[in-house]
């Protein structure tokens, strides 16, 4: 199979929760970062909420009690960033937020067969995810499982070549919004239509489930991913998402 390595398509998980503990004061959860049990992962369950300074201090205290050396946030909208910056968090990544209407969607001609991605396939999906996104941004089995169950309606699909999974997509719908939550393609097989086929399948499913808007995010400087989404009618919103980190092992 002719394949060429291209830059990884890093995508965070809009609309998902990758965590294990629920804080009482606000809707947020704290877990661990994939492959880094010493790094706390904080996710706001309501993307539009603005935490207070006291909320942020409480989360820092929780992470410190759990022995974390750092705490990282999930993707934050601009309005939620202020209290974190005031507490000493710094920016570690910026994500472009893209959307497109789904009132109508005409599926493209299928070039490859898209198959269900089941739990027994997660180990293969993890391999692809880490190879595409690297050890810092790649998901482990638990994180991918969380993504599959993060929305009321979920859709996980893969493409297989010679009995080997070479790409997968995880999609969810909540209300009238569809989220392309994770898209990963083996670096050796990128730019051969695998990602495009998976995006097409995801959008068709969102439309079938009644979503009127589709959303996805990716690294703000990831030109290949931005170009791919542009071909599907996604347009970049004015607001970007950011991920923040606070080192706890250097704080007094």
Spell out what each predicted region is.
Residues 2-64, 169-181, 186:
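Conserved donor-binding loop and adjoining core beta-sheet/short helix segment
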Residues 127-139:
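Helix-loop element at the rim of GNAT/NAT acetyltransferase active sites that forms part
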Residues 72-80, 216-226, 242-249:
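Conserved beta-strand-loop-alpha-helix junction that forms the acyl-donor binding cleft
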Residues 84, 89, 229-230, 234:
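Conserved active-site tyrosine of GNAT-family acetyltransferases
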Residues 50-61, 185, 191-204, 208, ...:
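Conserved acetyl-CoA-binding loop-helix of GNAT-fold acetyltransferases
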Residues 63-76, 206-218:
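Conserved GNAT acetyl-CoA-binding A-motif
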Residues 113-125:
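A short beta-loop-alpha structural element at the N-terminal edge
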Residues 32-33, 138-162, 166-184:
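A conserved beta-strand-loop-helix scaffold within acyl/acetyltransferase catalytic domains
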């Amino acid at each position: 199979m002719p394949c060429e390595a291209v830059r990884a398509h890093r995508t965070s998980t809009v609309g998902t929760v990758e965590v294990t503990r629920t804080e009482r004061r606000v809707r947020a959860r704290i877990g661990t970062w994939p492959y880094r049990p010493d790094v706390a992962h904080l996710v706001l369950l309501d993307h539009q909420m603005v935490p207070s300074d006291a909320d942020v201090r409480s989360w820092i205290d929780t992470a410190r009690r759990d022995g974390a050396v750092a705490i990282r946030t999930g993707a934050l909208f601009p309005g939620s960033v202020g209290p974190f910056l005031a507490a000493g968090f710094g920016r570690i990544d910026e994500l472009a937020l893209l959307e497109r209407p789904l009132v109508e969607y005409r599926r493209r001609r299928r070039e490859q067969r898209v198959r269900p991605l089941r739990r027994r396939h997660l180990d293969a999906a993890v391999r692809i995810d880490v190879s595409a996104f690297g050890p810092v941004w790649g998901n482990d089995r638990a994180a991918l499982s969380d993504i599959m169950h993060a929305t009321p309606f979920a859709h996980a699909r893969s493409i297989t070549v010679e009995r080997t999974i070479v790409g997968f997509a995880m999609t969810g719908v909540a209300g009238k919004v569809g989220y392309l939550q994770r898209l990963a393609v083996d670096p050796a097989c990128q730019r051969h239509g695998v990602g495009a086929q998976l995006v097409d399948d995801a959008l068709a499913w969102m439309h079938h489930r009644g979503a009127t808007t589709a959303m996805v995010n990716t690294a703000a400087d990831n030109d290949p991913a931005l170009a791919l989404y542009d071909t599907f009618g996604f347009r970049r919103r004015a607001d970007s998402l950011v991920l923040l980190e606070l080192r706890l092992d250097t704080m007094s």
